[in-house]
Amino acid sequence: MKKREDMTEMQVHVCLNQGTEYPFTGKLLDQQKKGLYRCVVCHSPLFVSDTKFDAGCGWPSFFQAISPEAIRYLDDYTLSRPRTEIRCGQCDAHLGHVFEDGPPPTGLRYCVNSVSMAFEDSETGELIEG
């Protein structure tokens, strides 16, 4: 588990303070390699690359979590319309939000801050923090 003092300023802002990175700025937005997306704080698996798609919204988007336990869902009323916040199911780090405008087969769009994830390349094992 990553300690607060070992996190970047942006990781603290997003993961611990429910912030949002600017759209189209995240390191993992255009990641096309095969692999696993993990929580940057506790390294729990969140998404597989096969479920990633280009939603055009500026943040990495996925249509399905790796397992039902991987994600925790919370009602979010901080903006003018209700949303569903998503957090890591293991450490409770803020990840982003989920919307019901995604592609088949789920119809869901998990809109995730790059900085809240680390990508593990399935070929090399390299871990790249967003």
Swiss-Prot record:
Family: Belongs to the MsrB Met sulfoxide reductase family.
Stored SUPFAM superfamilies: Mss4-like
Cofactor (UniProt): Zn(2+)
One Pfam family in the UniProt entry: SelR
MsrB domain span: 1-122
PROSITE patterns linked: MSRB
InterPro entries: Met_Sox_Rdtase_MsrB (IPR028427), Met_Sox_Rdtase_MsrB_dom (IPR002579), Mss4-like_sf (IPR011057)
NCBIfam families recorded: peptide-methionine (R)-S-oxide reductase MsrB
GO molecular function: peptide-methionine (R)-S-oxide reductase activity; zinc ion binding
Coiled coil: none
Lineage, broadest ranks: Bacteria, Pseudomonadati, Pseudomonadota, Gammaproteobacteria, Pasteurellales
Organism: Pasteurella multocida (strain Pm70)
Residues annotated to bind Zn(2+): C39, C42, C88, C91
GO BP term, example: response to oxidative stress
Taxonomy, superkingdom: Bacteria
UniProt protein name: Peptide methionine sulfoxide reductase MsrB
Cofactor binding remark: Binds 1 zinc ion per subunit. The zinc ion is important for the structural integrity of the protein.
Keywords: Metal-binding, Oxidoreductase, Zinc
Catalyses which reaction(s): L-methionyl-[protein] + [thioredoxin]-disulfide + H2O = L-methionyl-(R)-S-oxide-[protein] + [thioredoxin]-dithiol
Active-site residues (renumbered): C111 (nucleophile)
EC number(s) per entry: 1.8.4.12
GO cellular component: cytoplasm
